[in-house]
Amino acid sequence: MSVGSIISGRKPVIGVSGESLVRAIVALLHQHRIGAVLVMDGSAIRGIVSERDIAAGLHTHGAAILDTPAADVMTS
C-alpha cells in the first residue's frame, strides 16, 4: 500500500516553512480543520508540527510559544 493510496480522498496536506510562526500554524490548523502541518524546506520534508507539539509548548513556555518558529517546535 502506498502513501498516496492512504491519503487519497482525504484533506490536502498543508506545508509551512521552518520560519513560520506557531501563531500562523494555529490559524492554518483551525482554518483547514487539521491536526498537523508539514515543515518543508523547498520540496523536502524537514518535520511536522502537530497540535500536541503546540500544546506541549504552551505548557512549557506559555503564550510565548506563539511567536516561535516552526523549526523550533517541530518533531523531526
Language model regions located:
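The conserved cystathionine-beta-synthase
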Residues: 15-33, 40, 58, 71
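A glycine-centered beta-loop-beta connector
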Residues: 29-32, 37-53
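Short active-site oxyanion
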Residues: 12-14, 44-45
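Tandem CBS (Bateman) regulatory domains
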Residues: 1-12, 26, 50-76
